[in-house]
Amino acid sequence: MKKLFLIALFALLPFSLNAESNLDKILSSGVLKVGTTGDWDPMTMKDPATNKYKGFDIDVMNELAKDMGVKVEFVPAEWKTIVSGITSARYDISTSVTKTPKRAEVAGFTDTYYKYATVPLVLKKNLKKFPTWDSLNNSKVTIATTLGTSQEEKAKEFFPKSKLNSIEAPARDFQEVLAGRADGNITSSTEANKLVIK
């Protein structure tokens, strides 16, 4: 059972505000402030050696700023406050934000640019123990998620019998699995593909 989700390219400043005046503000300041977590490989990653961001979303934002004739400023953000950073005008725009009804009440979203599946991950040695989604929905199982992500909400929905361990960023849910503190984690197929390769 794979669950597909859609990601809007950006969450924008509160749509109740005049979009034209928001654009005017960005153009007159000459800076597009972009909120990004820097922890979702390959979309947005912060290089600890250089303190610079890289990834698909970063490339898109650099091109958008170039097309607008402004500079881009990447603002560190956390998943649990990614939308409130927009509504409080800490930054103008954010990337790779899953559109949910709750988020759409307070922020505008562009069209979807990327689709992914939400998938569980377990250690290879435990594949026989957890061959299906249902095998993870058990009161003896601990599922790790990253606090504030759409995957955290989906873990509650998919695994109501399991113990959920929501990890505060910058720590990551998969690290709990590797350390033996969780039996599995739930993440995007995008990140899962990168983790399986590693």
What are these regions (language model features)?
Residues 80-84, 97-106, 153-157, 175-198:
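A ligand-binding cleft/hinge motif common to bilobed small-molecule-binding domains
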Residues 4-16:
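Sec-dependent N-terminal signal peptides
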Residues 36-38, 109-131:
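Hydrophobic/proline-rich hinge and linker segments of small-molecule sensing/allosteric domains
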Residues 30-36, 54, 133-148:
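Short loop->beta-strand "edge-of-pocket" segments that line small-molecule binding or catalytic clefts
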Residues 71-78, 145-146, 162-170:
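Short beta-strand-to-loop elements that line the ligand-binding cleft
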Residues 23, 124-141:
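Flexible hinge/capping segments at coil-to-helix
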